[in-house]
């Protein structure tokens, strides 16, 4: 999509606007790959231009682009930032760093820029490792996080209208949304085969870049079995002991509980899965075990199961969960007796 044609996602822009000029706070946008974080940054930049900020003071650094693929250390990142900010003029500068988690131990540098003042910093990242270092744990680190999701159904219709595609809500269009999910780029692809290929490629990149490679998983086949299980059983109550028994007796795969827990945490950190805890409505206490796991996008299920038919119950539940999370709610599964 051309940079002049960006669908503005007001839900997230409205959360960021109060902090546009806050050079004492680092704005962190997290979410699964291809959910629209880069376009959100460009929307912020467009609004800054509309407010009269000079182009020289709006600086982008996309670490997934070819010219920055070799930037992997804090020193290399520092030199890259110095280079792109060399022409910045007087007044507040706006620094946008996309996919910053590609650089190991980036936090001290970003905090140093914040402490120097005069620069409003925006970061994006595709996983929870982004918020696990000095940015959070050191007293000097101050940040505000905006969690981003793929398109909700209303956003999906809004983007189709923006692109000049049929956008009147209908059972057929809603079924298409449930099946293919809300990865923004897929909404502009009319051909069904091309759209499926795009979603499959996105999911493959997520697993390769944010899970397998980054965490150096030794037994990839075992990890694949685990991730397949959780993707195929999304929105269902999950008991780790039952998962271990299933893998052992049904797929003849042995796995230790700590290994299963580790792999599950990796899928959560990569924003592929979201854990929804159980809550007892009678005692008003959180319950241990039986948590549900929802997909970041229902298109992940379709991409990993080429000929599978969508099951409306779990899909509707998943869409409702991500819709509520995107609106800023904390969600749990309420239980009273045997009912939920």
State each model region's role.
Residues 37:
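Conserved lysine of the Walker
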Residues 2, 126-128, 133-237:
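Interdomain motor-coupling "hinge/lid" segment immediately C-terminal to the ATP-binding subdomain
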Residues 57, 192-340:
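Accessory nucleic acid-recognition modules appended to NTPase machines
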Residues 29:
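Hydrophobic anchor at the beta1->P-loop junction of P-loop NTPases
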Residues 40:
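Hydrophobic positions on the alpha1 helix immediately C-terminal to the Walker A/P-loop
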Residues 61-90:
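Short glycine-rich substrate-engagement loop in P-loop NTPases that contacts/grips substrate
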Residues 1-17:
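N-terminal pre-Walker A segment at the start of P-loop NTPase domains
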Residues 50-65:
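Conserved catalytic segments around the Walker B and adjacent sensor/switch elements
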